[in-house]
Structures are given as structure tokens and as C-alpha cells.
Amino acid sequence: MADENLQPLFQIQRVYLKDLSLEQPNSPAIFLEQEQPTIEVAVDVGAQPLAEGIFESTVTITVTAKIADKIAFLVEGKQAGIFEIRNIPDEQLDPLLGIGCPNVIYPYLRANIADAITRAGFPPVHLSEINFEVFYQQRLEALAQQQADNSSGIVMADGSAARH
């Protein structure tokens, strides 16, 4: 019976839409434009502990559509999930929160973003799949580079690292 309490546990407690905003600063005139918009997508992932063995993981997507120099729409959504994670080795916890949890909640966010764009009167934007493992590795590399850049230990008044 004691062995059961030490079994690794990864369980979804809840998936929810934490934040969703839509801006159409140039409507209704933007609907008269014939040109196809350019689409920019930004992604961010976060996680935080809520209680012992309970974590919140978030994926934030910002979609900006522009026609010429005018913003057609800007949609930002943050999908979150609460996960119970127990008896996972420490070296596996960060990748689980940065890769596994986002893989679970991202499909919900994709659907919510597409729905908001369609309801705003625009053609749907279908967000592609995201390889969160590659995204996680890129974040680790950026963090390592940032730490290497700040290795002098001297921080300037503006928060930047001193350069030699």
C-alpha cells in the first residue's frame, strides 16, 4: 500500500480560459479593405505552484492581423490548466510543466482564439501545432545566454549587465 503513494502522478484537475481580449481599433473601415492581412503570432508559456503537488500551467497566444499599417485585429488569449503532479523527480518537473502541460492546454486555446476571431467578423485564423519541446529548449538556451551575458556580476542602474 505504501508503494502506491510513491507512484508518479500526473493528473489534469481543470482546464480553463484565464484571459481573452479582442481589439479592433480600425473597424468598421477595416472591413472595406480588399488586401489580405499579414498575421503575426507570439507565444508564451508559464507555470507556477499553487499548493503542494498542484501547479498551474499557462499558454498565452497573441495574434495580430495588419492590413498595410493598420491593425485589423489583435487577439490575446491565455489558457490555463491546473495539474496535480506528485512523485516526479525534480529534473523532470520543469520539462513536464514546460512541455507536457502546454501540450494538454494548447488545443483549447487554439479553438478559443479561432472562435474569437470568427465572431469578430474576420475569416478564421488556424494556428498551427507548436512543438513545445523545441520551444522549451529555445527558452533554456536564451536563459543560459542571458546568464552568460550577466556573468560579470555588475549590474548597471538601468538593470543591464556591465560590459568589459
Curated annotation (Swiss-Prot):
Cross-referenced Pfam families: SecB
One Gene Ontology term of the molecular function aspect: unfolded protein binding
A GO cellular component annotation in the UniProt record: cytoplasm
One of the GO biological process terms: protein transport
InterPro entries: SecB, SecB-like_sf
Top-rank taxon: Bacteria
Keywords on record: Chaperone, Cytoplasm, Protein transport, Translocation, Transport
Location(s) in or outside the cell: Cytoplasm
SUPFAM superfamilies named in the record: SecB-like
Family: Belongs to the SecB family.
Self-association state and partner proteins as the record states: Homotetramer, a dimer of dimers. One homotetramer interacts with 1 SecA dimer.
Chain's role: One of the proteins required for the normal export of preproteins out of the cell cytoplasm. It is a molecular chaperone that binds to a subset of precursor proteins, maintaining them in a translocation-competent state. It also specifically binds to its receptor SecA.
HAMAP family tied to this protein: SecB
Name by which UniProt lists this protein: Protein-export protein SecB
Organism of origin: Janthinobacterium sp. (strain Marseille) (Minibacterium massiliensis)
Organism lineage string: Bacteria, Pseudomonadati, Pseudomonadota, Betaproteobacteria, Burkholderiales
